[in-house]
Amino acid sequence: VRSSAASDVYKRQQILFTSLDYDDYIGRIGVGRVERGRVKKNEPIVLCKTDGTQENVRVSRLYQFEGLSRVEVDSAAAGDIVCISGISDINIGETACSPDCIEPMPFIKIDEPTISMNFMVNDSPFAGREGKFVTSRNIRDRLFKEVETNVSMRVEETDSTDTFKVSGRGELHLSILIETMRRQGYEFQVSRPKVILKEINGKTCEPMELLIVEVPEQYVGAVIEKLGSRKGELVNMGTRDGGATHLEFRIPSRGLIGYRAEFLTDTNGNGIMNQVFDGYEPYKGEIVTRERGSIVVHETGVSTAYGLFNTQDRGRLFIPAGVEVYEGMIVGECAKNEDIVCNICKSKHLTNTRASGSDDALRLVPYTEMSLEQCMEFIKDDELLEVTPKSLRLRKRILSKEKRLKQQFRGK
């Protein structure tokens, strides 16, 4: 008795592309499963595109996977996962068919971007120290290369040659790109994430998410409280086998920025969450994510235990002693709703009655080490996140205190 895959070999070919890859030499590569028939190298096929049009193309190269590597083959049969090159504008969800039997499969819908950030050339005083790729040309080429395979991402050039607008499916989507780039040696800075708003029937609408959460029963209250403060609406609740509670929320996309780290903390790592785009709805109003100001560095230098000791009563610190800092860099969160400028590089003046090692006796409160996602949520519109292979630094857009005050005066 033949299996269904074996019997499909004798039918007309049909390949559904579910992923993309890219090679600098051969260009874009479509990855998909041969649903039926057999595909051969150099044979003509018809590509059924997502907009309903058809394009006659040829299989210039055909690959299959062996472990993690691609191996070139002459043919593949139904059931095989193949990689096909020679189609320059192929996209996910499109179908390759035999010219004699054009039957496209149902298209896979790709969610549109909901959140955008600006990627900029790093212009801080420490620019170029830690990164290998630092110029606007390097950053531009890397971002547009990402779009070749990451179909949910959009990259646009702006009026400034040093700034690129990158739109993605959410905070996690963009943070993965940022982390990947810094591991590859790129150095740049990013702005605060913003949701992509739309005008629908004369109303300003924002993207919504269906958030599905499973947590142990003892953490349900904390999760509902946090999501409620982020404009989340509980639409379904149930119990799973084993004592887990199933929760479903409808929540604005901006309400989930920075929440994943909070969720893991609130559930002690025992919770599971997943989100799906759920359309656009009228703007839900302001979501308060940070009511406090920033602790900003007064001058360039190295942080000292004495300087941090005199600053720690003003709020929460993000760095230890012995870290290089520059004017305008953010090193903590102020306890009040205002920015304060502190000199954390200040050291004791040595006298006959003060030993040089007296700083060691100062007792510092443990500092908070911020993750990438926490940094992305923390920054305000007048702040930036500096990303390098070795460091994540928060900073003001305008580094000079005098220039910031002039800007505030002009704004008033």
Task: State each model region's role.
Residues 15-19, 33, 40-47, 57-64, ...:
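Solvent-exposed alpha-helical segments within well-ordered globular domains of core cellular machineries
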Residues 151-225, 229-233, 239-246, 250-252, ...:
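Conserved structured catalytic cores and adjacent interaction surfaces
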